[in-house]
Amino acid sequence: MSQRKENSGKIINISSVGGKIYTPMGAWYHATKHALEGWSDCLRLELKSFGIDVVIVEPGAIKTEFDVAMDYQHETTATGPYGELKKKMIKVMENAYKPGNYSEPQVIADVISKAIRSRNPKTRYAAGKMAKQVLMGRNFLSDKGFDKMIMRMVDGPSSN
């Protein structure tokens, strides 16, 4: 409310490149990030006339405790009908989060600071390891092409 009265301000939402892509066993995560992206886009349009900027930060691979959520999901799906797929996805995630394959959280803090200081911030900031590359790949490929790319990562190069 005070931002509207001041006719200026910034709202910065932390999403993920996961708000633009999708992976097997990730519906729970990707759905929340897709929703945050859509909500932020709508909010940006609604608040523009009040001088309020809405910014989305889309981190790539960042060193966090995301693995705790993944461990819980593994416990609940490892022996069911999705067990084999889940095991493959665990390997993909383990590879993605090997040392050197992720960025430190400070990268995101720096981007947030940049957006706050900017007089005219971007609507989106992709930051962290692989963020820009993942988003560029998603924009370049058709849905079916992206599906094939993801499944090659999961199943290996011989997958269809």
PLM ranges: what are they?
Residues 13:
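Rossmann-fold scaffold of SDR-type NAD(P)-dependent oxidoreductases
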Residues 16:
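Residue(s) in the substrate-gating loop at a strand-loop-helix junction
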Residues 21, 42-52:
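Active-site-adjacent segment of SDR/Rossmann-fold oxidoreductases
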Residues 1-7:
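A short helix-coil junction within the Rossmann-fold of NAD(P)-dependent oxidoreductases
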Residues 54, 93-140:
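Core catalytic loop region at the nicotinamide-binding pocket of NAD(P)H-dependent oxidoreductases
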Residues 32-35:
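Active-site helix of classical SDR
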